[in-house]
Curated annotation (Swiss-Prot):
Gene Ontology BP term (one): glycolytic process
Protein name listed in UniProt: Glucose-6-phosphate isomerase
Family matches, as SUPFAM superfamilies: SIS domain
InterPro entries: G6P_Isomerase (IPR001672), Phosphoglucose_isomerase_CS (IPR018189), SIS_dom_sf (IPR046348), SIS_PGI_1 (IPR035476), SIS_PGI_2 (IPR035482)
Source taxonomy: Bacteria, Bacillati, Cyanobacteriota, Cyanophyceae, Synechococcales
Main function: Catalyzes the reversible isomerization of glucose-6-phosphate to fructose-6-phosphate.
Organism: Synechococcus elongatus (strain ATCC 33912 / PCC 7942 / FACHB-805)
Pathway membership: Carbohydrate biosynthesis; gluconeogenesis; Carbohydrate degradation; glycolysis; D-glyceraldehyde 3-phosphate and glycerone phosphate from D-glucose: step 2/4
This protein's encoding gene: pgi
NCBIfam families from the UniProt entry: PRK14096.1 (NF010696)
Subcellular location: Cytoplasm
Length: 528
């Protein structure tokens, strides 16, 4: 295309909403009008399915559940008065709790105010709160936040060391719908141990965000934790940021959660439009479908040109990949769907992997996220008439142009600033785009059987470990092959070897002797 033709295409496909000052540019995606026309029937089906979902239909057929994250920012959409009241009551309880913490009405037993938050959760129970806290945390935050988002002992130690004596003034939020997520349970037990070692009572500083009636809920009631907030079975982890999962920590940090919900609600209204060209989420889904031929054949690279949006790509990685990465479609046919997502931030990435994006394998499309406001207040001049923010903007435009010149497609999202309203809108935009795309390709975006398969496999490994320890404690040194035979686990010999190696490295009673280059020569014995 000539420069004039490209400009005209930009004008033809530019989406702008004045209420949010939000721009979406898909002009650098290579689809034509014929493709758009061919997709219209699919989109009409997707719009109808989305309307049914919002009305309370069973949109997650595998688990026979409603999907209600859109209700969280507009309770009147919920299909029953009871649900509407429940959503409003939870929000009011979060706001009241945060106010009492900030005012000192709720305080740790030491009598001082809470200084820190330790949020324990994994997956959607961590990625959303981490993204929002990084994007929106005030410079003079009312509390500092830390996360246990794994089951890494060294990671636990690092966070606890950072807290130090402030553990006595730390509010611990444990987030788990079932209360049985192993990583979250482990983090809770680790921090309870740290409290006990310091002679601090845990319950007066503990808050549960969990399903009503769950194991964790019962623990919190029995031990008289400071507070409990609900997680609903109609809200999935990856779409839970605007529930108690994300709103509680955000409110405690002093983030305007009312504005965040309002931004999401505004974007929801825009993305209900049944005209494809007037629906920004549909335009995203259209572009994704075009890029990967409806089969996820190209990766999505997220490039936010703003430090505060650093974690947005990680948040989207789960939202998109866990939702769309499915083996089977709704009819049970094997389809192997999904879109791989990665990214960091601009312009840092221009000094990392953008070289490959421009000149390497063309197996991706990029999404640039542009923020118009550089900072609050004036900027110093770094060159005559040029600021650091001008450089950042120029680098974004230059990278976009350089990719297009080499046949690499891209989308550009532009927001006026990074604030609570805009972050809420971005979350809602991608939630809707994922739902629409899932309908286009005929999959269930709201379950995650692959995650459950990994959990079951891990449980099997731990059961083998228990059997190994019991066998070795009988006192007879054994080869790895002999252990496998004795346990009737010959097909798990590699797993047995790796368990033994891990136990020895952590001085857990196992000693291995023999040639490390040849694991079959190793003899395992129990050291009392």
């Amino acid at each position: 295309m000539t420069a004039q033709q490209l400009w005209q295409r930009y004008l033809d496909w530019l989406y702008y909403d004045p209420s949010l000052e939000f721009y979406l540019d898909i002009s650098r995606m290579g689809f034509d009008d014929a493709f758009v026309t061919s997709m219209q029937p699919k989109f009409q089906h997707a719009f109808a399915a989305m309307a049914e979902l919002e009305a309370g239909a069973i949109a997650n057929p595998d688990e026979q559940r409603m999907v209600g994250h859109y209700w969280l920012r507009d309770p009147e959409l919920a299909p029953t008065p009871e649900l509407q009241t429940q959503i409003r009551d939870t929000l009011a309880a979060i706001q009241d709790f945060a106010l009492k913490v900030h005012s000192g009405v709720l305080r740790p037993p030491t009598g001082s105010r809470f200084t820190d938050i330790l949020s324990i959760g994994i997956g959607g129970s961590a990625l959303g709160p981490q993204f929002v806290s990084e994007a929106l945390r005030p410079q003079a935050a009312l509390l500092q936040i830390h996360f246990f988002d794994n089951t890494d002992p060294a990671g636990f130690d690092r966070v606890l060391a950072d807290l130090g004596d402030r553990l006595a003034s730390t509010l611990v939020i444990v987030i788990s719908k079932s209360g049985g997520t192993p990583e979250t349970r482990n983090g809770m037990l680790e921090v309870q141990s740290a409290f006990a070692q310091r002679g601090i009572a845990f319950a007066p500083q503990a808050v549960a965000v969990t399903g009503v009636g769950s194991h964790l809920d019962h623990v919190a009631i029995t031990e008289r934790w400071l507070a409990r907030f609900p997680m609903e079975d109609w809200v999935g982890g990856r779409t839970s940021e605007l529930s108690a999962v994300g709103l509680l920590s955000a409110a405690l940090l002093g983030i305007d959660i009312t504005a965040m919900l309002a931004g999401a609600r505004q974007m929801d209204a825009l993305t209900r439009h049944s005209d494809l060209r007037q629906n920004p989420a549909a335009l995203l889904a259209l572009s994704w479908y075009w890029a990967g031929n409806g089969q996820g054949k190209k990766d999505m690279v997220i490039l936010p040109y703003k430090d505060s949006l650093l974690l947005f790509s990680r948040y989207l990685q789960q939202l998109i990949m866990e939702s769309l990465g499915k083996e089977r479609d709704l009819l049970g046919k094997v389809v192997h769907q999904g879109i791989a997502v990665y990214g960091n931030k601009g312009s840092t990435d221009q000094h990392a992997y953008v070289q490959q994006l421009r000149e390497g394998i063309p197996n991706f499309f990029a999404t640039f996220i542009e923020v118009l406001e550089d900072r609050q207040g004036p900027s110093p001049v770094v060159e005559p008439g040029i600021t650091s923010g001008d450089y950042l903007s120029g680098l974004l435009q230059g990278t976009r142009a350089a990719l297009y010149e080499n046949g690499r497609e891209s989308i550009t999202i532009t927001v006026p600033r990074v604030d609570a309203q805009q972050v809420g809108a971005l979350i809602a935009l991608y939630e809707r785009a994922v739902g629409l795309y899932a309908s286009l390709v005929g999959i269930n975006a709201y379950h995650q059987p692959g995650v459950e398969a990994g959990k079951k496999a891990a449980a099997g490994v731990l059961e083998i470990q228990r059997q190994i320890v019991e066998l070795l404690q009988q006192g007879q040194p054994l080869s790895i092959a002999a252990i496998a035979d004795d346990l009737g686990q010959s097909e798990q010999i590699e797993t047995i070897y790796k368990i033994l190696r891990h136990l020895e490295a952590n001085q857990r009673g196992v000693q291995l002797t023999g040639d490390r280059h040849n694991p079959l020569s190793l003899i395992a014995s129990w050291q009392r």
